[in-house]
Amino acid sequence: MQNPEPAHGVVLVADDEAGVRALARRILEGNGYGVIEAADGAEAVAIVESHACVDFLIADLDMPVMRGEEMARRIRALRPEIRVLYVTAHSEQLFTDRPELIDGEAFLDKPFTVRGLLEAVSLLKTGHIGDPSAVPAAVTTADEDSPVRRWWRKMKGLDPQ
C-alpha cells in the first residue's frame, strides 16, 4: 500500500488491468496527485474503509469480483464526497445500463490520453466545466451535452434528431 503526499488530492485507481493503473499513476503523480491502486472493486472498497485520505475514485466499469458501478456505490455510501470518474472501453454500454450520471461523477473513454485524464480529474475537482471547449469529447459529465449523451437520448427515443 502506498503512502502518497499529494498537492492536489489522492486518487484511488481501481482497474483490473495493471497497465492502465500504471499509466494513470504516472500521469497523476507527475501532476501533483497522490495515487493508490486497487486491482478490483473489493480491494478498492477495503482501501476506502481503512483510509480517510481518498478524494477521487477512478473506476473501471468492467472488472471481475465487483463491477465498477457497484464498487463506486459502496464507496460513496461510506464517503459521499468522493468524486468518481468512470472509465471503460465500452462507452456505448454505459448509458444503456445507466442512463444518468449524478453530481460528482464523470465518464472517460479508454484508452484515455494524458490530457483527457487530467482534464477529467480536474473537472471533478472543481465540480464544473470552466470552458466546455477545453474538455475532450471523450469526457462526459452529468451536465454536458456530449456525443455519447446525444447518442443515448437518440437510442432511448428522447431525442428524435
Place the predicted regions along the sequence by residue.
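Charged docking surfaces used in two-component/phosphorelay signaling
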Residues: 22-30
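Acidic, metal-coordinating helix/loop segments flanking the phosphotransfer/catalytic sites
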Residues: 37-56
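Acidic catalytic/metal-coordinating carboxylates
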Residues: 39-43, 66-71
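Short amphipathic alpha-helix used as the core "switch/output" element in two-component signaling
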Residues: 46, 69-81, 96
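Active-site residues of response regulator receiver
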Residues: 60, 88
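Receiver (REC) domain active-site loop signature in two-component systems and cognate sites
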Residues: 63
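C-terminal output helix
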Residues: 112-122, 133
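CheY-like receiver
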Residues: 128-161
